[in-house]
Regions:
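Motif-centric detector for short Cys/His coordination patterns
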Residues: 1-92
């Protein structure tokens, strides 16, 4: 997919440097995002947060039990709002 992550490197605190399939890259600050929702409880400690991997084009933790949609990560990294109509036109 257009927004799949192809590379992820831990930066600091709750920040990860991401590179996307479409060539865009940047740092996603996920501290506020993971502070809500019971699903993220396990990765609210820095030690657990650092244990991410890239699977199926997105970030996952705990062997895939926790993930964040690549579109969400793209928006948080680039600041660009995704409009799916434009994606269909680009990818045809």
């Amino acid at each position: 997919m257009y927004f799949n992550i192809i590379e992820a490197v831990y930066s600091d605190k709750f920040r990860i440097d991401l590179k996307f399939r479409n060539g865009k890259s940047g740092i996603a600050d996920l501290e506020k995002y993971i502070s809500d929702g019971e699903i993220f409880t396990d990765i609210r400690s820095i030690d657990n947060f650092k244990k991410f991997s890239v699977e199926f084009g997105t970030l996952t933790w705990n062997n895939g039990e926790i993930d964040i949609a690549p579109e969400t990560l793209y928006e948080k990294t680039t600041g660009e709002k995704i409009v799916f109509e434009n994606i269909v036109k680009k990818t045809g």
